Each structure stands twice: as C-alpha cells, then as structure tokens.
Amino acid sequence: MNPLIQEITKKQLRDDIPDFRPGDNVRVHAKIVEGERERIQLFEGVVIKRHGVGISATYTVRKISNGVGVERTFPLHSPRVEKIEVTRHGQVRRAKLYYLRALRGKAARIREKRR
C-alpha cells in the first residue's frame, strides 16, 4: 500500500477497541443524528461476523427486537461508534454465525466461554 495512504489511515485507527470475536455479546453505543440533535443509541446483541482488517474492518451484530431479527453492520474504527462493551464471551466453532438466522428461542443460545 502507498505510504501516504498508510500514514493517513494510521491516524484514523482507534486504540480503544476491546478484543471481541464472533459469538460474543456486545453493547454498541452508536451516535445517531436526528435533525439538530445528536444522541447515543444502544445496540446490544451477538456478533455474527467480523470482516476485513485495518480501517475498513467491520462487524455485524444481531439481536431480536419484538420477535424480529435485526442485524446491523458497524465499521470497527468509525467515529460514529462511541464505545463497544463486551458483555459476554461466547464459545463457537465458526467465524461466521449465519446459521443463527434460522434458529429461534433457546436453540439460538450460544454457550459461554470459560476463561
């Protein structure tokens, strides 16, 4: 990669990102702009995938809201994400947990990792 691009992206990388993997439960504090106001919206769910490296890395969080599955993809180094909290570490054997989309209720639970 071009050294100039590397220098610019290095300044934009965040260093306050916790270590989390697919299967972990996270609480994402996202900044939402509504007209003139800016507020923090919580999005809590299971990380079903992480993708990419560097400034373009993303992760997808899935939660069930009113019986409907909701997935939201966040850029890992986005300034719109105020903070990421890991609430629970899950033990899974896959990097992409797309199979959770077909599961409901107790079948969609993920075993907690023993640390």
Swiss-Prot record:
GO terms for cellular component: cytosolic large ribosomal subunit. The keyword Ribonucleoprotein applies. InterPro entries: Ribosomal_bL19 (IPR001857), Ribosomal_bL19_CS (IPR018257), Ribosomal_bL19_sf (IPR038657), Translation_prot_SH3-like_sf (IPR008991). GO terms for biological process: translation. Keywords: Ribonucleoprotein, Ribosomal protein. Gene3D superfamilies: 2.30.30.790. It comes from the Bacteria. The keyword Transport does not apply. One of its GO terms (molecular function) is structural constituent of ribosome. Belongs to the bacterial ribosomal protein bL19 family. This protein is located at the 30S-50S ribosomal subunit interface and may play a role in the structure and function of the aminoacyl-tRNA binding site. This is Large ribosomal subunit protein bL19.
